Amino acid sequence: MIRFFSRRLFLKGTVVTLGTLAVNGFSISGHAAPGNVLTAYFSWSGNTRGIARRLHQKIGGELVEIELVTPYSEDYNTCLEQAKRDQERAARPELKTRITDMARYDVVFLGYPNWWATIPMPIASFLEQYDFSGKTIVPFVSHGGGRLGQSVTDIAKLCPSSRILEALSVRYSGGSSLSGDMDAWLGRIGIRS
């Protein structure tokens, strides 16, 4: 099921831009070419990774996984403790992933799991590490029932000079409806064949 951020969030200052950017036969308003699109994602369980790969097949551009210098534990309960502690301290875990020329990207599709109704701290690290001024950020979120939480609002707070488009909300890995849900979402945000 797809959900998007509220009108209230829009009215609080998040700018939604629908222009025309050519991306692998698609277009989003107001931007340039497929090489100017980055799909960056953080995934612990693999759900967000699968969504990111499917999205990348549809839109092209560059695909980058946001990885940590010290990854979270592979054990679910230990990971929960580590990630919750990071959330409580508003930690900014050090990223192993480096984007050498972020300035070349106009549009950043940003994928992450909803942890405690917001972005995981590695996403906060990523958003603070680069200048997103003037860029269009398009969130996509995997979740176990919490949908977007306040994640889009938190992205807008970290990137006040960016345009944020409607987010895609995907329960777990999206199942058999993912491709159709993704196509409908891409159409709503102005990406079309």
What are these regions (language model features)?
Residues 27-32:
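Boundary at the C-terminal end of the N-terminal hydrophobic targeting segment
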Residues 2-5, 33-74, 81-82, 87-193:
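FMN-binding flavodoxin-like domain, especially the glycine-rich phosphate-binding loop
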Residues 1-18:
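N-terminal secretory signal peptides and thylakoid transit peptides that target proteins
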